[in-house]
Design a protein with these regions (language model features):
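N-terminal Sec/SRP start-transfer signal
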Residues: 1-32
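Hydrophobic alpha-helical segments typical of transmembrane helices
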Residues: 6-10, 48-49, 87-90, 166, ...
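Residue-level recognition of transmembrane alpha-helices
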Residues: 25-27, 40, 186
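Alpha-helical transmembrane segments
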Residues: 33-69
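Short amphipathic alpha-helical segments
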Residues: 59, 123, 228-232
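Short acidic/polar micro-motifs at solvent-exposed secondary-structure junctions
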Residues: 66-83, 89, 102-133, 147-160, ...
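Short secondary-structure junctions
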Residues: 93-100
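Mid-to-C-terminal secondary-structure elements
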Residues: 128, 132-152, 156-242
Length: 242
């Protein structure tokens, strides 16, 4: 219930100490202002990270090996080792809640680049060995043709999917890309698809258009990798936190 006497008392108290009233009001205003700024910055950071991830599934992680931190059975500390094909199968078999486990390899290691030849033109690009489900983990737009499929995996087909940046640098304007051949470290690959990355990571966005994807099994065979796995892209089921 409205009480005139109470409001008069409040107004008199505020008028009696105008400086304290001003400082208190400023403190309340400043606190609200900072809260709004922090909430806005938090949302902006979240949106920025999502854009920079370039469509990468939010329930996907990457796993790779590092040097050992302890000696083991007479072997020294600091040893380097690799995942192998059986490790991939073990994860699929023994770990519940995984939707995709995609082994990956890259020529030259992390951020490695290798000469790719098309006729008289040469370029340095990242070349990846992948499984078909990788396009579900890091989506990309297929502009022409197709992505890698399990027929390619089973038959070790020498096929590749290339980015728009590769076409701009190695092909003449208007030249037919699908069905052409491109040479990677001396091995000929048939171009079966053209992709466009949806990455928004600044300068990396341009580099993400300059990649080649080939079947994982073909990669291991063509480049003498044996059963080595560089790293894995692992996607959990929707109801499983990672």
């Amino acid at each position: 219930m409205f009480s005139r006497d109470k409001w008069n008392e409040i107004i008199e108290a505020l008028s009696a100490n105008p400086f304290r009233t001003l400082i208190t009001a400023f403190g309340v205003f400043w606190g609200i202002f900072i809260l709004v700024i922090l909430l806005s910055a938090s949302q902006g950071l979240q949106n920025g990270i999502k854009r920079q991830m370039g469509g990468l599934s939010t329930n996907t992680m990457f796993m790779w090996t590092q040097a050992t931190s302890k000696p083991y059975k007479g072997l020294p500390q600091g040893r380097n080792f690799n995942f192998k094909n059986p490790d991939v199968e073990a994860l699929k078999r023994d770990v519940d809640g995984l939707l995709y486990v995609s082994p990956r390899n890259q020529l030259g290691g992390f951020r490695g680049s290798n000469n790719v030849v098309r006729g008289t033109k040469t370029g340095a690009y990242n070349v990846y060995g992948d499984y078909p489900e990788f396009i579900l983990q890091q989506p990309m737009n297929i502009l022409k043709g197709r992505f890698i499929n399990y027929g390619d995996i089973a038959n070790n087909r020498k096929v590749t999917v290339i980015g728009e940046g590769v076409i701009r640098e190695l092909y003449a304007p208007g030249e037919e890309v699908l069905g052409s051949y491109i040479k990677v470290q001396g091995v000929n690959f048939l171009v079966v698809g053209v992709y466009k990355s949806i990455s928004n990571m600044g300068g990396d966005a341009e580099e993400s258009q300059k990649q080649l994807f080939i079947p994982f099994t073909t990669f291991q065979q063509a480049f003498n990798y044996g059963d080595i796995v560089g790293w894995m892209a692992i996607t959990a089921q929707d109801d499983v936190p990672i």
